[in-house]
Amino acid sequence: YVNTVNPKEIKGPHLHKNRTTYFYCISGDIVIVIEDNEGVIHEISSNANLPILISVPNKLSAAIINPTNNISKVLVLADVAWKPNDNEMENTDFKDYDWLKWKK
């Protein structure tokens, strides 16, 4: 599916218990913030001019951020199909992460 991310919007963080998710920026600019198994935060930038495929394995928390003043679009792919009421997603929180820096 295509996910639209509004200017300065933060989607997430959350994790998927069973599926690996792939993100590919098709319009605008995005930052994917991922917390690895050791609690280290990684910020991966991508845009439509230099797109990269970003893979987030299951059980890792991630958020999508649009740091710009324009709408961005992200192609989101998964290796396991979504099913209603499967409780496969879990909201999370990066305790010491500075989310406010993206609102400036």
List where the protein language model places each region.
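Non-catalytic, conserved peripheral segments adjacent to functional cores
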Residues: 1-53, 69-104
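Asparagine-centered strand-capping/turn motif at beta-strand->loop junctions
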Residues: 64-67
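Alpha-helix/helix-capping structural signal
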Residues: 59-60
